[in-house]
Amino acid sequence: NTTGNYNVATGRLALTANTTGYNNTANGYLSLSGNTTGYRNSAYGYYTLQQNTTGGHNVAVGMEALYSNTTAYLNTAVGYRSLYLNTTGANNTASGSGALYSNTTGANNTASGYYALYANTTGANNVASGYQALYSNTTASYNTANGMKALYSNTTGSQNTASGYQALYYNT
């Protein structure tokens, strides 16, 4: 830390690279360790927001949540490896182990449940609620899936709504 202000770091190598970043909280081994100028981030758990450099206003709770995030803003990840591969995707919310795991640049997505929106990479404005809802979605946008494995096989189909157990399961 050189000129950063109002930072809190607990845990080995937490906030190690911080230079001018401010209002960050890092709690856990290597949490926010790559942060240089990012600000107003909260990281709780082993390797949370580990690769963040300049991203701000992110919240990561759970081992390796938002691990790959570098410059993205306004993301919330709660659960083991939620939003794990996210780098620049902004304004995403993931709750549940592996939720939005593969997301890289997709924005404005909400995933709640174990592996919900798991394969999403660039798809935007999707909502998935339930165990593996919208699991296979990669690039599709504007989908809503509520229920266990709803829209499970969907990869590129957009503007779909599915509600119930395995609703629109085979839609691609």
Name every feature range the model reports, one short phrase each.
Residues 1-172:
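Glycine- and small/polar-enriched repetitive beta-structure motifs of secreted/surface proteins
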